[in-house]
Regions:
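Structural signature of the thiamine diphosphate
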Residues: 188-211
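Cofactor-binding active-site loop characterized by glycine-rich and histidine/acidic residues
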Residues: 1-145, 151-152, 156-171, 177-182, ...
């Protein structure tokens, strides 16, 4: 318990426990956020391949919840001892397979969220299957999809999030390209169709959507 208290109040960084765990997909979100130590993130973050942010966030979540469960288990055992429970071994056995699904509401509020972030290529295209897997996983993981409607990281090519007839910096109108001839992939509708996640479609014009 002394170690747990130290980790929450100070930890290796002397700033206490992190408020969030951030898994970034290589791409536009990497460029917008710049590279360490010049990025603006005041919390631990990791950068992975274009398509892997949702999948890695699943592993990050499971590992983090295992660590949180160990802490909560120690607290529950201490509470049982303070309450004078005589069968300490039985109390310990009841927590043998204790996991995040058994956390109380108060315990869940103490768990920093895990957030996966990626742009059009990472979520609409090459990593679409990983995004779908996270939506179906039933884990309280947050995913932020940056809908720039082009492949921003590589200069602005047309991509699945663009609208019919789209022209862009790297796909200008000309003899060989008369505009995008595919309909837009509506990621919000596809996400809602999974039936397992809360979907919010926001806009930078109203930044309170993100708060």
């Amino acid at each position: 318990l002394k170690d747990l208290k130290w980790r929450y109040e100070q930890g290796p960084t002397k700033t206490g426990r992190a408020k969030l765990g951030f898994m970034n997909a290589t791409g536009c979100s990497s460029v917008y956020g710049s590279s360490f130590p010049f990025n603006p993130y005041p919390f631990p973050w990791s950068n992975h391949l274009f398509q892997d942010a949702p999948s890695v966030s699943l592993g990050l979540f499971e590992g983090h919840m295992r660590s949180m469960a160990d802490g909560f288990k120690a607290i529950r055992m201490a509470e049982a001892e303070l309450a004078g429970e005589t069968n300490f071994g039985e109390a310990e056995e009841s927590l043998r397979y204790f996991n995040w699904r058994e956390f109380t509401d108060d315990e869940l509020l103490l768990c920093p969220p895990v957030v996966a972030v990626g742009g059009d290529g990472a979520m609409y295209d090459i990593g679409f299957q990983n995004l779908s897997r996270v939506l179906m996983a039933g884990r309280p993981i947050k995913v932020l999809v940056l809908d720039t409607q082009v492949y921003s990281n590589t200069g602005g090519q047309a991509c699945p999030s663009g609208f019919m007839g789209q022209v862009s910096d790297m796909a200008p109108y000309g003899p060989a390209w008369k505009g995008k001839n595919e309909v837009r992939k509506e990621i919000s509708l596809i996400g809602a169709a999974h039936g397992t996640a809360f979907i919010l479609q926001g806009n930078l014009a109203n930044y309170t959507h993100m708060i």
